[in-house]
């Protein structure tokens, strides 16, 4: 078993102060590894990076036939909880005759600083629609209604979650050894880094009209690329890097240092895990891989922000930087 390799370095002055190590793969349209760092067989929980897979049964089944690209993007989102996100998810719920109480994700303050500060200023209490996963849960409820299934759609034995597990194992081409309960209360199934890279490559290679699954995959990544602002929000790596890429690339972060990318024009899928769970490490690593693949200009402001981020102190003095390690440079 290969060990994790240094992927991102934190420099203070002339010294490397900290290192984020991890595992990563780039897979081709057949799922074969084109390039790897660390251990491709490392077992991981993909967390929110698996949302495109969790949305797959909804689209593939026909339940999403009348959904807009915005709704599909939100079904894959870890959104900021800004008004542009919550208004659209609330409208989606209203279309189904449902309300905030029908969610099972739980409430939390918006992830986006502006939306969070506004709620604090006005004394507003967060609802479940402010949960960054509320779009995914609206998707689960869409599939629940299509199936005629019960209200407790987060239960691992619920038909919705069984469909998600089946899709997950089919696209990763692995039997999941188990799951953990994610922050939004649904099962998050384990696989290898290679498995997630293989799954993303399948999305990248999918052809619209080939079959229901491939058509669903194309609809999902196209929605993400068309609406990067809905997948995360201003200032977030997913959104800013999708906007910056020179060709369509779908990006999705996951908690605890996970990130995936779908590159449809190249038939490539990327998956990476920073083992200490640091988002700054995962953001830098994915930006570095995108530069390496030639789809992100290293001089683009978004690339510099996440790949070569300047560290400043409270007096705005530059004290160091975040940058890719030699393995990714």
Regions from the PLM with identified roles:
Residues 19-24, 138, 165, 256-259:
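Short glycine-rich loop/turn motifs
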Residues 1, 69-176:
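Active-site-adjacent helix/loop patches that line small-molecule binding or acyl-intermediate pockets
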Residues 46-63:
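Active-site SXXK
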Residues 37-45, 75-79, 122-131, 181-187, ...:
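A short glycine/serine-rich beta->alpha loop
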Residues 60-66, 97-101, 147-152, 158-178, ...:
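Bacterial peptidoglycan biogenesis and beta-lactam-recognition machinery
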Residues 1-41:
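Beta-lactamase-like hydrolase cores
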Residues 13-16, 130, 248-252:
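Short Gly/Pro-enriched turn/cap motifs at secondary-structure boundaries
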Residues 203-329:
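Structured C-terminal helix/loop/strand segments within mature extracytoplasmic catalytic/sensor domains
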